[in-house]
Amino acid sequence: MAAAEEGCDAGVEADRELEELLESALDDFDKAKPSPAPPPTTSAPDASGPQKKSPGDTAKDALFASQEKFFQELFDSELASQATAEFEKAMKELAEEEPHLVEQFQKLSEAAGRVGSDANSQQEFTSCLKETLSGLAKNATDLQNSGMSEEELTKAMEGLGMDDGDGDGNILPIMQSIMQNLLSKDVLYPSLKEITEKYPEWLQSHQESIPPEQFEKYQEQHSVMGKICEQFEAETPTDSEATHRARFEAVLDLMQQLQDLGHPPKELAGEMPPGLNFDLDTLNLSGPPGANGEQCLIM
């Protein structure tokens, strides 16, 4: 009996020791258990993700998106493709140097996109284009005639916010190129030549139905158009810069005379590329800025 009790006590003691061992092991496990990981925090936006575009970039994108429509409306399809390529190249260079100037050109494109049959929309576009070209012409002429040294010119451009710091001075040639392309032989000559060739027959068939005073103006229009065509036909690849400049000024003077004579007959003006409509106000570079053009002035 005593032996049995001793055996029982030994078993209980062994169970107690096992229980203590297990509890000790559990305590050690709890101490070694790593603390819970902190909840994941919201990561900051990826710096390489989409960024908000600057006003200059926005204007540039909008301008490139609309310029093709602008030239399609202003010129015929073949010339529009060439003008689009030249304009896009020039504007990309300009956008890198002067984003705020791109925004001004965008206003011109937007005005062209709103041109419709009503007089108000046409006036908005013609006024905008006239004042844009007036600003380009005035500043180009002033700089050429100022006699400023290279250093003085650089300082002046810095004062106008036109210095990009690399000293390339590409703004003026770009402005001149755009202006001369708009008033070039490729743009004006084809339509003017076609109207000039059709004018004599039209005058003959309408002489009896038109008031004498108006008929005389149409005759003068025909004569001036012929002189403009002669200026363009006199161009040669070997012409000097002075010759180009003199011819450009002569064409501007003739276009002013043409404007003073009023619009040509609708039957003939219809031969002009869509969007141009022979509105000579768009080419009047010598007149004072109009009230509506102030929003479109570049310089």
UniProtKB/Swiss-Prot annotation:
Removed propeptide positions: 297-299
Tissue specificity field: Ubiquitous.
Q: Where is the lipid attached (S-farnesyl cysteine)?
A: 296
Task: Report which superkingdom the organism of origin falls in.
Answer: Eukaryota
Q: Which residues carry this modification: Phosphothreonine?
A: 236
- Where is the PTM N-acetylalanine found along the chain? 2
In which family does this protein belong, per the annotation? Belongs to the peroxin-19 family.
On subunit structure and binding partners, the annotation says: Interacts with a broad range of peroxisomal membrane proteins, including PEX3, PEX10, PEX11A, PEX11B, PEX12, PEX13, PEX14 and PEX16, PXMP2/PMP22, PXMP4/PMP24, SLC25A17/PMP34, ABCD1/ALDP, ABCD2/ALDRP, and ABCD3/PMP70. Also interacts with the tumor suppressor CDKN2A/p19ARF.
Protein name, please?
Answer: Peroxisomal biogenesis factor 19
Which organism is the protein's source?
Answer: Cricetulus griseus (Chinese hamster)
Q: Which gene encodes it?
A: PEX19
